[in-house]
Amino acid sequence: MTRKNTTTNPWAKFHGPNLGYVIEQYDLYVTGAGSVDPELQELFEIFGAPSFQDDVVTGDNTATHFSPQNTGNIEKILKVVQLVEQIRSFGHTLAHINPMEDAANGQSLLERAMNELSDADLKAIPAKTVWQDAPEGIHTALDVIHRLKEVYTQSLAYEFSHIQDSEERAWLHQMVESNSLRQPLSNKKRTALLKRLTAVEGFEQFLHKTFVGQKRFSIEGVDMLVPVLDEIVLEGAKNGVEDVMIGMAHRGRLSVLAHVLEKPYSHMFAEFKHAKIEGAVANSGWTGDVKYHLGREQVVSNEEVSTRVTLANNPSHLEFVNPVVEGFARAAQENRKKSGLPEQDTSKSFVILVHGDAAFPGQGIVSETLNLSRLNAYQTGGTIHVIANNAVGFTTDSYDSRSTKYSSDLAKGFDIPIVHVNADDPEACLAAANLAIQYRMLFKKDFLIDLIGYRRYGHNEMDDPAVTQPQVYKKIKNHPTVRAIYADQLQAAGVLNADEIETITQFTQEQLKSDYAQVPPADTSDATIHVKVPDVVAKGIQPIDTGVELDSLRAINEGLLSWPEGFNVYPKVKKILERRKDALEENGKIEWALAESLAFASILQEGTPIRLTGQDSQRGTFAHRHIVLHDTDTNETYSPLHRLPNINASFSVHNSPLSEAAVVGYEYGYNVFAPETLVMWEAQYGDFSNTAQALFDQYVSAGRAKWGQKSGLVLLLPHGYEGQGPEHSSARPERFLQLAAENNWTVANLTSAAQYFHILRRQASILGTEAVRPLVLMTPKSLLRHPLTLSTASQLSEGRFQPALEQENLGTKPNKVKRLVLSTGKMAIDLAAEIESGKHEYNLDEIHIVRIEQLYPFPAEKVQSIIKRFKNLEEIIWVQEEPRNMGAWHYMAPILFELAGDKVKTGYIGRPDRSSPSGGDPFAHKAEQELIVAHALDVKYNFRQDKLEIEVFSN
C-alpha cells in the first residue's frame, strides 16, 4: 500500500524531460509493466503519484488546477514533453530558412506529434510542467508550443541537440527562447542597416553595368554577408578584440573589401580599368594576382570602438585559406617575448571563415582545420564560420554536391552549434551574428552560421546559369532583392517613407559615380612580359657568419643535459643524452640532433622565438630529438630549452595531428603574422608532405610573388633511399625544384650536422628582413647518427653555411682529374662511405666529388671555380639515388650543361625512369645502390654483365 507523505513534495523539483521520465516510471510502477529503479520505487511508496498543483490560466482568465493522477493525463504529459524537445531539436525542419522555397515541408515527425494533442489537451497542462523557465505570459502547454514554434520554426533555425556540454546547450536554448536575441532594433540601426544593404547592392550593380563581362563573383543573393561581418567585427571590438582575421573565397570578396575593410570605391574601379590612382597602396607582389584574390588590412572603427581587420590573400583553391588564417590568429594571440611556452590570450583576436555551401562539405581541408580547433597547439579560442549558402556550386546542385541535408552538417561532428538563417531576413541575420559572437567570447569555441540565400547571376558574370538551373533562375529573376524587401518592411513599419528611401538610394549612386570620376584612363605603360623581381630578392641571401663561441656552446650543452631534481628520465633516453656530454670537447663528435638543439638554444638566446610542429616532433620520428622529456613516474613533461639562461624568447614544440595540409597552412599563416619567429614544420616522412602540395604550390612558393606576402617557414622533410619502399624514401625534391624560381625559397639537402646548425642559424638571421624566404630541407634518416655526418665543435663555432662542399682528400692532383662527380644528401655520403671502406680499388686521382648542399639557388660561382682548377676535365656527372625522372636530375641537367661548356661532357648516373619512387625489395635496393656507387667511382669490373639496368650516361 502507498504511504503518502503530505508535508514534502519531491516532485516539485522535476520539470520538462525529467518530469516526463518520472511520470513514465510511475506508470510502470502502477501497471507493473516494467522494472522501476529501487530508489524511485521507494519514493512512489512514500509520496504516491507525482502531483503537480499548478494554476492554469484559461481563456476566460479563470484558474483551474491540474494534477496528473486526478486527470489521468500521464500519457498526454509525456507527449507534450516529447513534443517540446522535438520542436527544440527538429524545429529547423519546419523553418522558412530558404528564400527560394516556401516554408519547409519536411514536417512529418513534428506534425504527427502535434496532431496527437488537441488544443484542449494542451490548455489543460500548466506551462511550468513542461518548461520550467517559461517566460512571463506563458501559462499553458499550448502557449509553450506556440512560443517554441515561433522561436524555432521561423526564418532563424537552430541545431543545438548535438552539443555534448549540457551547460552550453542550456545557455544556447535560453538565449534563443528568452527573446533577448530578437529584441526590436532601434530605428537608427534599422536605417543604418538599410543604408548598408543599399551600398552593397548599389556597388554590385554599378560594377555589373560599368564593367560588362568582367569577372567579379557577385555577392548578390547573400548581400547580408556584409552586415553580418560588420556586426561580428564591431561586437568583437566591444569585447576588446584587437585583431579580427577573415578568410574567404572570391564570392562576394570585392564587396567585403569595399565595405567591411573600407577599400575606397575609386581604388576598386581603378583595378577594373587597369588605371593608376593616387593614394592606392600596392598590396601585391611583382607578378600580382587577380583582384578577387587580394587581401587587405584595415583598422575598422565606429564612434565607440576600433579593431584591426585582416582579410587574407586567397587563391581559388577553395577553403585552403582556412588553416592559414587560424595561424594568423594564434600568432596574434601569443606573447613570444619570454622564455618557456608562449603566453596565449584568445580574447585578443578571433577568426571569421566564410565558406561556400559546396566547398564546406566538399573540401577535406575543412575537416582537417576543424579538427585543429580544440588541440592545444592550434586552438584559437573559437572560430565563427559563415556559410555563404547560395545552394549551387558553379553548375552543380546541392543534391549532387553533398550527402547530407544541410551543407553545415559536417560541423556537427565537431560539436559546433549551428544556426540556419534566411538571408532575406536582415534582422534575423544580425541576431545570428550576435549569438555567434557571444557564444565564441563566452565559451571560446567555434560557432557556425548557415546564411541561406541564392546566387543572382552565374558562377561568374559571363555565365548563363539558366542553362543548368532553368527553373530556379526563373524564380530568382522575379525575386526582389533583400534591400527592396527590407525597404518595404521599414516603410510599412513607418520607420522611413518612400522619399527617404529614395534619398538613400540616390546618395549611394552619387557616391559611386563621384568615385568613378576620380579614376584616370587605363594605363598599360608598365605592362611587360619581363617581370622585374625586387633587387633584394634577386641577389639572394648574402653570406652570413653563423658560428657561436665555443664556451657558449658548452654552456648550452650543459643546460640541455640537465633536468629538475626528482625528474625521472626514461633510462634509454637518459643514455642517449648522456652520450652527448663530451660532444663539444676536443675529441668529441656532434650528431645531427645535438647540432639542432644547440642551434635552437643559440637562436633563442639571440631573441628569436621558435615554433616547431610535426606528427612526432617532440621525440623525433627516428627517436633522435628528445627535446621534450617525459617523467616515467608522473608523465609530466620538461623541455631543457625552457630553462636555459639568457633567453628572452619563447620555444614551443608540438606533436601535430595526423594531417599535413591543414598543419602546413597553419604554420605558414603563423609565420606570416609572426615574421620574427622561426617557424618549422616537420613531416613524419617526406613522402607524406605531398598531401600538402596545394599549400606549397599556392602559398609557400608563390605567396610573395603574387601578394607580397613574405614567409620564412622551414620545411623539414625526411628523405633518403634506404630500402624502405615507395612510401618511406622520397620527399619528392623534384617538385620543390620545379617550383623554384625568382629566389622564392631555398632547397637544401645536407651532409653534416654542422651544415644543419649553420643553415638554421642563417635562416633565423634573415627573419623579418627583406631577404627572408622559406627553407625546404631534405633531412636525414639513417644519416642522423652516421659517422660521416658527425661534426666537431670547431665546425660549429667557426664559419658559416657552405652551399657546396668538396670531398676531402680528393682532387689533390688537379691535372689528373677527369671526372667531376656532383651529388647531394645521402647519395654523397654513400659515395664517401664507399671510398672510406677501401673494399674496392679506385683510381681516385682521376675523380673529384662535390656535394651540392644547397640545390636552389644553385651555387654556380663556387662550382665554376672548382671546375676551373681541373684543366683536363672530361666529364661532369650528376649522381643520385632517385629515379632519373625524379630527384634533382632534370633541374641539374641544364645547369651542368652551362657549367661544362663545349669541351666537357655532362652525364647522369642513377636509377632509370620509374613511375614509383622506390622499389619494395630491400635486397634489390641494396644491389642497385651499390651499382650506382660503383659506376660513379668507376670501380674496375665489367658492369655490363650485371642484370640491373642503370642509366649510365646522358650527353
Curated annotation (Swiss-Prot):
CDD domains: TPP_E1_OGDC_like
Catalysed reactions, as listed in the record: N(6)-[(R)-lipoyl]-L-lysyl-[protein] + 2-oxoglutarate + H(+) = N(6)-[(R)-S(8)-succinyldihydrolipoyl]-L-lysyl-[protein] + CO2
InterPro entries xrefs: 2oxoglutarate_DH_E1, 2oxoglutarate_DH_E1_bac, DH_E1, KGD_C_sf, ODO-1/KGD_C, THDP-binding, Transketolase-like_Pyr-bd
Cofactor(s) listed in the protein's UniProt record: thiamine diphosphate
GO biological process, one term: glycolytic process
Enzyme Commission designation: 1.2.4.2
Similarity section: Belongs to the alpha-ketoglutarate dehydrogenase family.
HAMAP family: SucA_OdhA
Name this polypeptide is given: 2-oxoglutarate dehydrogenase E1 component
